[in-house]
Design a protein with these regions (language model features):
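Gram-negative/organellar outer-membrane beta-barrel architecture
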Residues: 1-113, 177-181, 185-195, 200
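Extended beta-strand-rich architecture
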Residues: 13-17, 59, 90-213
């Protein structure tokens, strides 16, 4: 069992997790139980969030990790000029893989993550949605010192009531791992009062060149 806290001016968070390994292959197959509380005050987002989740993980020799998830969350939030409370119960699937060579400053590597999450009022959620996400980072080095970092993220939310999608599930861009030169999560559509609303669709990409002295 583990417990972690994160404290900063825009976010305070408490997370707990418990892993139950399976006897057949305890390092590669296990259940993960999680719970958390979070308070956010960032840009035009204010939110209090409670979460619970149970996940079943599989890993294989190729490095791909697969998971089936069932998540519950309760959000009371203000996004821009809209204040609401949303309760969600939603299953999902995800696959991801991370590879690297070169220690703390990898000279070669990649990270890939793909996920689908589904919510429906049929089983008690406040809204229906389907959320698709793909996140990729590639690192390659030429002639020992010339390091290139490629990033690409795509997200899509299909829903019958976007205003009730919690801010954590909406898409915001900006920051050094998204669009450099913009504040963290400061790029999204804005409402008539020039407040950030978050987006239902997102596509970002970047290429960085780094020279290692």
């Amino acid at each position: 069992m583990s417990c972690s806290t994160y404290l900063s001016q825009p976010k305070q968070q408490l997370d707990m997790s418990y892993i139950v390994p399976l006897l057949k292959s305890p390092l590669e197959q296990y259940y993960l139980f999680q719970g958390g509380l979070k308070r956010t005050d960032l840009n035009d987002t204010k939110a209090d969030t409670s979460t619970l989740a149970v996940s079943r993980y599989w890993e294989n020799s190729s490095g791909w990790q697969k998971a089936l998830n069932l998540r519950w969350r309760l959000d009371h939030y203000t996004q821009g000029t809209v204040t609401d409370t949303t309760m969600l119960l939603y299953p999902g699937v995800s696959v991801n893989r991370t590879r690297s060579r070169g220690g703390m400053m990898p000279t070669w590597g990649d990270s890939q993550r793909y996920s689908v999450d589904v919510s429906d009022t049929t089983w008690g959620s406040d809204i229906d949605f389907v959320i698709l996400q793909a996140q990729n980072v590639w690192i390659r080095t030429l002639a020992e010192r010339h390091r290139f970092v490629f990033r690409g993220n795509v997200g899509w939310i299909e829903t019958n009531d976007f205003d009730r999608v919690p801010p954590d599930l909406r898409f915001f861009a900006g920051g050094d791992r998204s669009i450099r030169g913009y504040k963290y999560k400061d790029v999204s559509p804005r409402d008539s009062d020039d407040k950030l609303t978050g987006a239902s669709k997102m596509a970002t990409g970047s290429v960085e060149y780094q020279y290692n002295f």
